[in-house]
């Protein structure tokens, strides 16, 4: 089976899902990840305007599968301070799951939430409350809780915190995990020198079978920086060797591996996606990281 690897791609204009599939195919990808609209607002097109059938036909023709949706950043079900933010998060997440199912994706990646000053324990309680509200309807979609870097008041930057959330949710068979390499590195896990040790720890605390998506990113920061700044493959503190090992790890062979690395180019007008090169690099078809 060919390596299940792709990147974040856009979905906009008239073509919508077809455009996403065309972009992914142009990178030589076998999978991809999308937002169903702008990640910073709630404006969304109707499901019938997402051009799903044409998108699916193009995907089938070009060997693209196991696509992933990312929930927008504006969802924060960990917010204990503003009931309206929590309510918006729950309602919007519910509608995003509906759209995810319509598109044919099985995983929607979610940043668990930020406690905005109330403390991790209170934030986690709120996240559990929100997920219990969202996961009442029967849908063929799992929410993939993302491993976070620990920036600001983020919850879910340790495996123990994610385990607490999962244990508190009634229908937790509908929860999975998105393992982000930059975030786990920035949170303090030594994925560079001891990835198997980190995976064993994850397995002991959560269960490795919960990992259903992997975000492949290098990091601009040293381990434990709690910063969350993605870097291009081979240009950061994780490095190509460690990321190559993770991408080709047996545990992840049937799991979509998604690049979210920064666009490259000397100035703002010249920015372009690095994904065609980075996918080939991680397929071991190229030897050198992309020139920035």
From Swiss-Prot:
UniProt cross-references to InterPro entries, sorted A to Z: AP_endonuc_2, AP_endonuc_F2_Zn_BS, Xyl_isomerase-like_sf, Xyl_isomerase-like_TIM-brl
Domain of life: Bacteria
Binding-site list for Zn(2+) 2: 146, 180, 215, 260
Any GO MF annotation of the entry: DNA-(apurinic or apyrimidinic site) endonuclease activity
Swiss-Prot/TrEMBL catalytic activity: Endonucleolytic cleavage to 5'-phosphooligonucleotide end-products
Cofactor: Zn(2+)
GO terms under biological process: base-excision repair
A Pfam family reported for this protein in Swiss-Prot or TrEMBL: AP_endonuc_2
Cysteines engaged in disulfide bonds, as pairs: none
Positions of Zn(2+) 1 binding: 70, 111, 146
Cofactor binding summary note: Binds 3 Zn(2+) ions.
Residues annotated to bind Zn(2+) 3: 183, 228, 230
Catalytic activity, EC: 3.1.21.2
Keywords recorded for this protein, A-Z: DNA damage, DNA repair, Endonuclease, Hydrolase, Metal-binding, Nuclease, Zinc
Protein task: Endonuclease IV plays a role in DNA repair. It cleaves phosphodiester bonds at apurinic or apyrimidinic (AP) sites, generating a 3'-hydroxyl group and a 5'-terminal sugar phosphate.
Family: Belongs to the AP endonuclease 2 family.
Protein name: Probable endonuclease 4
Organism in which the protein naturally occurs: Shouchella clausii (strain KSM-K16)
């Amino acid at each position: 089976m060919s390596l299940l690897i792709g990147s974040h791609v856009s979905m906009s204009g008239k073509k919508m899902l077809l455009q996403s599939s065309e972009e992914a195919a142009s990178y030589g990808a076998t999978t991809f990840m999308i937002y169903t609209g702008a990640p910073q607002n709630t404006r969304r097109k109707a499901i019938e305007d997402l051009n799903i059938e044409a998108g699916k036909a193009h995907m089938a023709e070009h060997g693209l599968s196991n696509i992933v949706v990312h929930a927008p950043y504006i969802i924060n079900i960990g917010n204990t301070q503003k009931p309206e933010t929590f309510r918006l998060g729950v309602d919007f997440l519910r509608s995003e799951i509906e759209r995810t199912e319509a598109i044919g994706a099985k995983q929607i990646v979610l940043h668990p939430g930020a406690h905005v000053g109330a403390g991790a324990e209170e934030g986690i309680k709120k996240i559990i409350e929100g997920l219990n509200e969202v996961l009442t309807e029967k849908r063929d979609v799992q929410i993939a809780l993302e491993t976070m870097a620990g920036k600001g008041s983020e919850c879910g930057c340790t495996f123990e915190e994610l385990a607490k959330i999962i244990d508190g949710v009634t229908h937790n068979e509908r929860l999975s995990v998105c393992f982000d390499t930059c975030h786990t590195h920035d949170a303090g896990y030594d994925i560079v020198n001891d990835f198997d040790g980190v995976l064993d720890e994850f397995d002991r605390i959560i269960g490795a079978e919960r990992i259903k998506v992997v975000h492949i990113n290098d990091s601009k920061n040293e381990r434990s920086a709690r910063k969350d700044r993605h870097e291009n493959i081979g240009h950061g503190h994780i490095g190509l060797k460690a990321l190559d090992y993770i991408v080709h790890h047996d545990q992840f062979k049937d799991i979509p591996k998604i690049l979210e690395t920064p666009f490259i180019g000397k100035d703002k007008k010249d920015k372009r996606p690095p994904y065609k090169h980075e996918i080939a690099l991680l397929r071991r078809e190229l030897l050198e990281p992309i020139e920035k």
